[in-house]
């Protein structure tokens, strides 16, 4: 029917309705299955027996530790084809894990299937000793995390016996990791001192077989054992007799520098100790290792105070040091101000903390520095003061001892004064000389010389740490190549001569 005039017809336009994208729900990832696949890839890399692949696997070991559990280890051990027939049984007894019923593999119905005879001459491919030892190491780390120390020690000792029986250079990294965690468990059990002979024998074996990573780990743990048991002479003797491996990791090198710094500090060689602690801080990881950095910084503060240097306030304000260095901040204030009363109060109040940090021996020696600073301030404040008044300010009951201390400060050049009395057998007093301009002395020159030497040493270390491109190999021609080159030159000369003749 035709539309009437005057009426408008509105036609609906066909518009494609916008399709709503419904996000597809991703299936939940099985973290255990992912971990099993990742570790199987690592085991396949270890089976190749190449050192750089083994190093790469051990570098990601901290990440792998977070992925392992009873389920993952059970699947790995059950599917691992080791040359040792009792490997799986020996590992599973440490796990104490029973798989769930739904995860067990159901047997196939093979009643109507004809069995095929295996091919003749085909031998099964067994896993390498590297992958066996790596699986043992993962089980050891799992037991260590669960604090099953007895089982972990038994497994670790079996692991070391197996490694040293194979005598392979590629097992050095795995042996070093095993030794490290064994020593950690020994220390946790309080039995580290009882295993000094064991560590020494392992160090001899590692040195004879050139196991550099094992050497580095054993040297560090022997030094730690000696220092914990206060066998400082034995620690110094060990450092003088062994050669630390050049290709050791930065973590082991940082520990070695830290222990050397402690030995030098207890030998009162503060300059060398400060240098070792500085290198330990540089070699420490940029992220993590907070406990190690805190331990090093405590010794740095004490060594600086013994050298007459007051630590910068910004050090104590850093988040990782704010809490652990609170006692050392109060100690530094007492040393800076020469406040003997405050120093004695801090020493008595935080004595337990200083003993735990093994810094109490050096902090007690700081008392002489505090007294010397106090005497300096007294000599600047008083042109003349009686010895008995100095004894009151220094909280010393004996005037004779106070006079000896003042005389020692005068002899060391700490103050410019004399001890005298107005009459014979009268009260003795300290007469200070007029303060001289320090810039007229050689002390600023000595300070500038120390700073310049430090900057030059830092520059030299930076230059040594640079990496340069390898030199291009200059090709050395053989006798035949030289003869061919000479023959070509003669022919070329003849051609040039012929061309010249043609031109004429």
From Swiss-Prot:
The 26S proteasome is composed of a core protease, known as the 20S proteasome, capped at one or both ends by the 19S regulatory complex (RC). The RC is composed of at least 18 different subunits in two subcomplexes, the base and the lid, which form the portions proximal and distal to the 20S proteolytic core, respectively. This is 26S proteasome non-ATPase regulatory subunit 3. It holds the Pfam family PCI. Residues 254-433 form the PCI domain. One of its GO terms (cellular component) is proteasome regulatory particle, lid subcomplex. InterPro entries: 26S_Psome_reg_C, CSN3, PCI_dom, WH_DNA-bd_sf. Acts as a regulatory subunit of the 26 proteasome which is involved in the ATP-dependent degradation of ubiquitinated proteins. One of its GO terms (biological process) is programmed cell death involved in cell development. The keyword Oxidoreductase does not apply. Belongs to the proteasome subunit S3 family. Keywords: Proteasome. GO terms for molecular function: enzyme regulator activity.
């Amino acid at each position: 029917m035709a539309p009437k005039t005057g009426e408008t017809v509105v036609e609906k336009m066909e518009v494609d309705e916008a399709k709503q994208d419904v996000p597809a729900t991703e299936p939940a990832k099985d973290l255990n299955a992912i971990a099993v696949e990742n570790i199987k890839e690592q085991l396949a890399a270890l089976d190749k027996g190449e050192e750089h692949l083994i190093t790469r696997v051990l570098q990601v070991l901290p990440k792998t530790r977070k992925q392992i559990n009873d389920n993952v280890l059970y699947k790995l051990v059950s599917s691992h084809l080791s040359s040792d027939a009792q490997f799986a049984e020996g590992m599973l007894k440490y796990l104490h894990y029973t798989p769930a019923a739904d995860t067990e593999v159901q047997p196939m119905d093979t009643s109507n299937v004809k069995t095929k005879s295996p091919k003749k001459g085909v031998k099964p491919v067994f896993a390498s000793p590297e992958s066996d030892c790596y699986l043992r190491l993962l089980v050891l780390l799992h037991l260590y995390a669960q604090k099953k120390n007895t089982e972990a020690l038994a497994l670790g000792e079996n692991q070391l016996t197996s490694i040293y029986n194979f005598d392979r250079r590629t097992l050095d990294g795995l042996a070093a990791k095993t030794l490290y965690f064994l020593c950690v468990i020994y220390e946790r059990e309080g039995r580290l001192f009882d295993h000094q002979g064991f560590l020494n024998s392992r160090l001899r074996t590692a040195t004879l077989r050139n196991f550099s990573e094992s050497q580095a780990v054993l040297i560090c743990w022997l030094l730690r054992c000696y220092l914990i048991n206060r066998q400082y002479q034995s620690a110094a003797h060990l450092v003088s007799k062994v050669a630390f491996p050049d290709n050791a990791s930065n973590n082991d090198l940082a520990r070695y520098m830290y222990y050397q710094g402690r030995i030098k500090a207890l030998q009162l060689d503060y300059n060398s100790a400060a240098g070792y602690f500085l290198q330990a801080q540089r070699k420490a990881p940029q992220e993590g290792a907070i406990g190690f950095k805190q331990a090093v910084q405590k010794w740095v503060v004490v060594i600086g105070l013994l050298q007459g240097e007051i630590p910068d306030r910004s050090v104590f304000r850093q988040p990782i040091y704010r809490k652990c260095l609170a006692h050392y901040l109060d100690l530094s204030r007492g040393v800076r101000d020469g406040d003997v009363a405050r120093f004695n109060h801090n020493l008595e109040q935080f004595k337990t903390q200083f003993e735990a940090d093994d810094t109490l021996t050096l902090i007690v020696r700081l008392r002489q520095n505090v007294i010397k600073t106090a005497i300096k301030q007294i000599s600047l404040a008083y042109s003349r003061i009686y010895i008995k008044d100095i004894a009151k300010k220094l909280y010393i009951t004996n005037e004779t001892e106070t006079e000896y201390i003042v005389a020692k400060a005068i002899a060391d050049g700490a103050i410019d004064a004399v001890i005298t009395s107005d009459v014979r057998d009268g009260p003795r007093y300290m007469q200070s000389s007029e303060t001289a301009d320090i810039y007229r002395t050689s002390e600023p020159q000595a300070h500038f010389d120390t700073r310049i030497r430090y900057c030059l040493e830092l520059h030299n270390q930076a230059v040594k740490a640079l990496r340069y491109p390898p030199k291009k190999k200059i090709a050395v021609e053989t006798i035949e190549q030289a003869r061919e080159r000479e023959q070509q030159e003669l022919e070329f000369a003849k051609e040039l001569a012929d061309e010249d003749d043609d031109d004429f």
